[in-house]
């Protein structure tokens, strides 16, 4: 496993931007759970969206690959609720992809950006998810 190649003695932070959309949910779950076991105290940060958004993003790719079941691909609506159930080692937090990091009350923010933010973060549940890997299982803490 590539895990053994990483010296995590000083901690480990992983970023997977725009990656998990192309994997099946069981594949993402297996990877996340294995990472939580291999890198206690580490972190994984990635972007996620709901099924509607994933379907739109993957529309061309799915058609070319002749894949019919977009529901099998990784998508998240409520990261804390859905992903916390994967492992006792996961501490899950998330913020809106656009609204979570920008103050839209600022007058310098254009109306079009506000509109995109509301569609992306609202209707499509686009979010940045942070998983903190516990040093021990919740049951033993």
Model-predicted segments: where are they?
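Alpha-helical subdomain
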Residues: 1-141
């Amino acid at each position: 496993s590539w895990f053994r190649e990483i010296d995590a003695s000083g901690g480990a932070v992983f970023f997977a931007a725009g990656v998990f959309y192309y994997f099946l949910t069981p594949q993402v779950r297996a990877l996340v759970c294995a990472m939580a076991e291999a890198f206690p105290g580490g972190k994984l940060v990635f972007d996620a969206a709901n099924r509607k958004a994933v379907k739109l993003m993957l529309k061309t790719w799915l058609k070319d690959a002749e894949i019919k079941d977009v529901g099998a691909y990784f998508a998240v609506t409520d990261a804390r609720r859905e992903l916390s159930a994967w492992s006792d080692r996961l501490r899950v937090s998330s913020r809106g992809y656009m609204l979570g990091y920008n103050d839209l009350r600022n007058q310098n923010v254009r109306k079009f950006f506000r509109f995109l933010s509301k569609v992306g973060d609202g209707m499509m549940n686009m979010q940045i998810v942070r998983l903190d890997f516990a040093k021990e299982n919740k049951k033993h803490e």
